């Protein structure tokens, strides 16, 4: 939707003409600079006494925002809304925008720069404080069909800049941004934003995780986080309401888990930095307690700390429906001729099902030596490395500290915290008595995060790596089991942790035979995907403690069989769940495997093993032990592979380091996976790391593509799935049946017949010279071709960009879209000069950094 200015409507709203407003005016001491303001932008502006009044038409009718430029009292004098042609009604009055900045340290050495995920930012020193506005200037300017009011100066936590209000003609949003920068290097940040006001006569509302609207009186109770749907909290008055919410994806830095951490707040004295009552959005400083990198803030970059206000005369569900429209209700909507595909999930469903079946088939735990899951048990512990004989009963641990189990960090899954532990290593000892020598085979009951060694009476009982979210029953080494005796015995434990969640607790259990009915429930993640409009899900299982079992045929094949069985059980005519893995061997870095049918393969090849053999139970089984084996497997089975999180995490340096390898040059190697990682709030696009990779590989002469990945573990009805997700729209006319194989899905990927979207911006049609993405265009003599792209969107658009390359350089041509409003669609047609170019692709981004990414069209 391209908007046209309606000066008469603003005269109706304000009772004055906007065309008489030129150059600058004085609002009682504060100069208002309007040299760059054009009243035909569709937003009316005037100075009235000590105030700046902004008015514009909206789908509801019209809105009027009055800013107090006196420097005294609340900055926002009022927000008023008119329904239809009715009278403007003041919805809220005397409110102050607030932004609290949390600044931490970025490790620029570990990965040689800003492209880093494995950074323990949340565990390093940080400081939080409000950004304070000292009103010294007001600049009003317009760009296209939008008007910006910049107020200076804004200062706090070594950052400085301005507070910006952006109004989009024809749109009901008020976009607030603290645009700030720092001169200090190696900084990472989080921000928290909202508003403060007098709570008298007001209520606060939100949609809870039960999907119901909740409403409470606004009062002066201490501020607390609220877990909500759609990342939105609202202030309600008798006249209407004001919803507050963040950019739906940009606000959320990358994490391994999509936990709902309570991203809104309400109450008094927020973070001990905001005086009085308020509501707003927030980030939890500790994140998911794993790797918590926050957002990059390089020196000199203008960080846009944004939040949206949506004022309305509506309240409750009606208000939230208006907010939800901007993300289609957190749903990836249908695009004709396309099916939605999402990839890279470590849901561990197979693992949990396997554990559940083990219990159904035989055991519950009778604790012989109690764990601390119900009541804290007494331990001796040391945070310094002890002498070598610390595992022996004769060792004197009286100088060690005393503590209750479990040990770790608050919030670590499965942990009942007894004693805080936040160093890298911990050593524990505990004496226990047995009334008699055990006749049954006992097991360890073990909760751990991360690598753990357990000793019984000085003999190694078990060693585990990684982490568990629940107590695991771990077999005891027979030699250690033999040491158990009547009377005193010793448990000695060493646990090592490298960041994120942190936990250790140990006991001994006796398996007891039981009889339980076998249940096959549908896991919650299936309904979450379906509700979000996802048609096809590609898993990346066994990226946990079972990953090493994939190298052992005796363990790997039953795991794969169970995975395949569950995928077919949970698939139906409208939803396809597909097996996949994220191996970390053979190629370099981490990579994703994808086959067009169930394939049995083992991630190891012993010296005496053939590449392929017929198994009496599982049929054809492949054994892969080298890059050549992997490539041969992919060629035989028509599979695809690509780099997981390329150039970051455990794929740092890849695929660049193996770009000359045969498997990379093969058509079986798709390319890389796209995710908005790392985060940088100064960037107008998300995920530049992988967009640059796409351009680089195209210039290498390799026809590769990038597929959107989500790369999270838990997905259930409590998670904030949509904020962390993206989607691939594949050019498919139907969802394949699992039983028939899903070769059309792989073909769409291999052909580049898809685009990536965050969900708010869509691209139903895209051609250059009549060719779609992944196809090859033979240029005519003029070397010109016609771009035709159909776009639709919810938030107002910012720009589209045509990206081309010639085998050496990358070229960008921006198409300005600031004439657009909210909830529009447009077909762009443009003649492109493609002389000397070998490929071309397109991106389009909105004002909240939501967008679409095409795959390349190849040029000859």
Language-model regions, residue ranges each:
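A metal-dependent hydrolase metal-coordination microenvironment
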Residues: 350-363, 513-638, 643-644, 650-654, ...
């Amino acid at each position: 939707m391209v908007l046209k200015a309606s000066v008469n409507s603003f005269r109706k709203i304000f009772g004055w003409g906007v065309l008489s407003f030129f150059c600058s005016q004085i609002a009682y001491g504060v100069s208002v600079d309007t040299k760059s303001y054009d009243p035909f932008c569709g937003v009316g502006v005037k100075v009235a006494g000590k105030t700046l009044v902004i008015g514009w038409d909206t789908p509801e009718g019209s809105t009027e925002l009055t800013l107090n430029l006196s420097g005294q009292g609340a900055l926002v004098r009022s927000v008023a809304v008119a329904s239809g042609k009715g009278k403007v009604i003041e919805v809220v009055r005397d409110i102050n925008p607030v932004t609290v900045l949390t600044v931490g340290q970025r490790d620029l050495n570990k990965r040689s720069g800003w492209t880093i995920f494995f950074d323990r930012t949340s565990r390093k020193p940080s400081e939080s404080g409000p950004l304070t506005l000292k009103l010294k200037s007001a600049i009003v300017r317009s760009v296209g069909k939008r008007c910006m009011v910049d107020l200076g100066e804004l200062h706090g936590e070594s950052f400085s800049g301005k507070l910006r209000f952006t109004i989009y003609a024809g749109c009901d949003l008020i976009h607030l941004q603290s645009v700030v920068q720092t001169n200090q290097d190696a900084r990472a940040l989080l921000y928290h934003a909202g508003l403060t006001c007098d709570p008298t006569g007001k209520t606060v509302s939100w949609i809870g995780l039960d999907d119901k609207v909740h409403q409470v009186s606004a009062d002066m109770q201490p501020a607390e986080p609220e877990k909500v749907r759609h990342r939105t909290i609202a202030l309600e008055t008798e006249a209407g309401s004001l919803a507050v919410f963040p950019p739906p994806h940009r606000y959320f830095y990358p994490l391994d888990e999509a936990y709902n951490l309570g991203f809104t707040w309400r109450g008094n004295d927020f973070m001990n930095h905001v005086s009085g009552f308020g509501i707003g959005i927030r980030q939890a400083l500790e994140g998911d307690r794993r790797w918590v990198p926050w957002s990059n803030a390089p020196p000199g970059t203008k960080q846009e700390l944004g939040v949206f206000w949506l004022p309305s005369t509506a309240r409750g569900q009606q208000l939230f429906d208006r907010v939800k429209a901007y993300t289609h209700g957190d749903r990836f909507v249908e695009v004709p001729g396309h099916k939605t595909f999402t990839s890279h999930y470590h849901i561990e469903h197979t693992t949990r099902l396997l554990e559940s079946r083990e219990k159904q088939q035989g055991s519950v735990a009778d604790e012989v030596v109690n764990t601390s899951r119900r009541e804290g048990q007494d331990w001796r512990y040391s945070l310094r490395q002890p002498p070598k004989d610390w595992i022996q009963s004769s060792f004197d641990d009286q100088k060690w500290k005393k503590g209750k189990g479990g040990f770790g960090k608050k919030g670590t899954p499965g942990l009942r915290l007894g004693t805080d532990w936040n160093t890298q290593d911990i050593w524990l000892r505990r004496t226990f008595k047995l009334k008699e020598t055990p006749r049954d085979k006992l097991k360890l009951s073990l909760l751990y995060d991360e690598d753990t060694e357990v000793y019984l009476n000085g003999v190694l009982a078990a060693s585990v790596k990684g982490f568990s979210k629940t107590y695991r029953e771990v077999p005891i080494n027979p030699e250690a089991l033999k040491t158990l005796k009547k009377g005193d015995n010793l448990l000695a434990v060493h646990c090592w942790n490298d960041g994120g969640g942190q936990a250790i607790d140990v006991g001994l259990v006796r398996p007891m035979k039981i009889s339980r009915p076998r249940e096959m429930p549908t896991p919650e993640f299936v309904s979450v995907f379906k509700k979000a409009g996802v048609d096809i899900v590609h898993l990346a299982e066994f990226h946990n403690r079972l990953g090493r079992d994939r190298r052992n045929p005796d363990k790997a094949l039953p795991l794969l069989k169970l995975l395949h069985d569950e995928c077919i059980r949970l698939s139906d005519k409208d939803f396809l769940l597909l097996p996949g893995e994220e191996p970390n061997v053979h190629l370099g870095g981490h990579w994703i495997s994808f086959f067009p049918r169930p394939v049995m393969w083992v991630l190891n090849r012993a010296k005496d093993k053939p590449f392929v053999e017929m198994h009496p139970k599982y049929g054809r089984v492949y054994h892969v032990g080298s890059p050549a084996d992997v490539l041969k497997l992919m060629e035989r089975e028509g599979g695809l592979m690509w780099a997981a999180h390329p150039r970051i995490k455990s794929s740092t340096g890849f695929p660049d380091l193996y770009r000359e390898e045969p498997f990379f040059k093969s058509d079986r190697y798709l390319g890389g996976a796209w995710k908005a990682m790392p985060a940088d709030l100064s960037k107008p696009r998300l995920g530049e790391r992988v967009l640059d990779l796409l351009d680089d590989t195209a210039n290498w002469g390799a026809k590769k593509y990038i597929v959107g990945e989500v790369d999270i573990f838990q997905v259930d009805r409590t998670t904030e799935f949509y904020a962390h997700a993206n989607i691939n729209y594949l050019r498919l006319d139907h969802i394949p049946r699992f039983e028939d194989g899903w070769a059309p899905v792989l073909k769409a990927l291999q052909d580049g017949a898809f685009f990536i979207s965050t969900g708010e911006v869509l691209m139903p049609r895209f051609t250059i010279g009549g060719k779609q993405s992944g196809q090859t265009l033979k240029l005519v003599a003029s070397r010109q071709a016609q771009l035709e792209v159909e776009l639709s969107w919810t938030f107002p658009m910012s720009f589209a960009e045509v990206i081309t390359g010639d085998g050496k350089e990358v070229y960008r041509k921006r198409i300005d879209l600031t004439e657009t409003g909210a909830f529009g669609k447009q077909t762009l047609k443009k003649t492109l000069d493609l002389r000397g170019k070998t490929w071309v692709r397109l991106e389009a981004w909105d004002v909240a950094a939501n967008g679409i990414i095409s795959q390349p069209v190849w040029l000859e």
